[in-house]
Amino acid sequence: MQAVQQEIAQALKVQPPFEGAAALEQEVARRVAFIKGCLNNARLKTLVLGISGGVDSLTAALLAQRAINELRSETGDAGYRFIAVRLPYQVQHDEHDAQACLEVIKADEVHTVDIAPAVRALAAETEALKGGSPSLVDFVVGNIKARTRMVAQYTIAGARAGLVIGTDHAAEAVMGFFTKFGDGACDLAPLSGLVKNQVRAIARSFGAPESLVEKVPTADLEDLEPGKPDEASHGVTYQQIDAFLHGQPVSQEAFDIIVATYRKTQHKRELPFAP
């Protein structure tokens, strides 16, 4: 492991690879206990999470629902609830995957909020967007989508006295692959420190189908490039990112891309700047 790999892995609190099924089960139990502790410390009983159809939100939701189930069982209090939220922009092209995730999760409640009217209204009223290039406008509006989704989740959490769960993990954090105050905003991040293949392993341990576990990850925020794979944006694969974070050798090109992207996106991981 090179020094910079160790530095980054420590900063992101990257967890070591799972050494067998027992280690995986132990990590699942630890993260479920973390979620329960967050609720208890806040003296709240509700968790809220947006479900996209990808493995990250699927895995976070499975952990959350298990935590809620355990709290209900341990306390006898039926007031503990997990709310899964669908947040499509009009009609999502992979809505079938989102619905398949909901079938696996079996959330206590499912809410749906179409973010399109709010996103369009804000974009239409923003003078700075007028006259911008199509690609720039598309990118900025993509970030509006992410932030609107978080506004919706916090609206539900506020109405139901709950906490919002985030889906960020180490393989996304190292690349700064999240929107500031959008999907990067949350009250607790139960996937923190995990690499992508560990997120998949946890989902698989819950019995999630391989079609969802191995689905090609995509942020799907930009209309000009719908369904664009994360890896196309990264310039490296998640396999390479995972290997880097676990101190394993990667190609020099992948190494340079990951380190440069980590440094360039540091402002997203340390907010806000202060004198």
From Swiss-Prot:
EC number assigned by the record: 6.3.1.5
Q: Which residues bind deamido-NAD(+)?
A: R147, K180, D187, H267, K268
BP terms from Gene Ontology: NAD biosynthetic process
Q: Which reaction does it catalyse?
A: deamido-NAD(+) + NH4(+) + ATP = AMP + diphosphate + NAD(+) + H(+)
Sequence positions that bind ATP? G50, I51, S52, G53, G54, V55, D56, S57, T167, K196, T218
Q: Which UniProt keywords apply?
A: ATP-binding, Ligase, Magnesium, Metal-binding, NAD, Nucleotide-binding
Q: Which Gene3D superfamilies match?
A: HUPs (3.40.50.620)
Domain of life where this protein originates: Bacteria
Provide the binding site for Mg(2+). Answer: D56, E172
Pathway listed = Cofactor biosynthesis; NAD(+) biosynthesis; NAD(+) from deamido-NAD(+) (ammonia route): step 1/1
Any one GO molecular-function label of the UniProt entry: NAD+ synthase (glutamine-hydrolyzing) activity
| One cellular component term from this protein's GO annotations in UniProt | cytoplasm
Q: Does the keyword Magnesium apply?
A: yes
Q: Which InterPro entries match?
A: NAD/GMP_synthase, NAD_synthase, NH(3)-dep_NAD(+)_synth, Rossmann-like_a/b/a_fold
Q: Which family does it belong to?
A: Belongs to the NAD synthetase family.
Task: List the HAMAP family hit by this protein, alphabetically.
Answer: NadE_ammonia_dep
What function does the entry list? Answer: Catalyzes the ATP-dependent amidation of deamido-NAD to form NAD. Uses ammonia as a nitrogen source.
Binding partners and assembly: Homodimer.
- This one is known as NH(3)-dependent NAD(+) synthetase
Q: Which organism is it from?
A: Pseudomonas entomophila (strain L48)
